[in-house]
Regions:
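N-terminal first-folded block
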Residues: 1-28
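Short alpha-helical segment immediately N-terminal to, or the first helix within
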Residues: 35-36
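A short, basic/aromatic helix-end/turn motif that makes direct DNA contacts
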Residues: 49-53
Length: 80
């Protein structure tokens, strides 16, 4: 699925999570999905734990994160 189509899966509604980006209007935030991936969860694990999600939703979260930071210059982040 192309990036533009994937990004249509990400929505923002001020009534849900204060307008944070969410997946297809559900109460599953992009932030949650990215956090789970960063913690080492696999796509299969996430789909098992959140059966309303589809594999393209997870790819959409990654595409959204890429779109957000694509033109940014990032500074080193220190993790303690």
């Amino acid at each position: 699925m192309q990036g533009t189509k994937l990004l249509k899966r990400i929505t923002a509604d001020p009534a849900i999570f204060g307008g944070k980006p969410i997946v297809r209007g559900m109460r599953i935030s992009v932030e949650l999905v990215l956090s789970l991936l960063a913690q080492g969860e696999t796509t299969e694990d996430i789909l098992h734990d959140y059966p309303d999600l589809e594999a393209d939703d997870i790819r959409a979260c990654l595409a959204y994160a890429h779109a957000v930071i694509a033109d940014d210059t990032l500074e080193a982040v220190r993790v303690s």
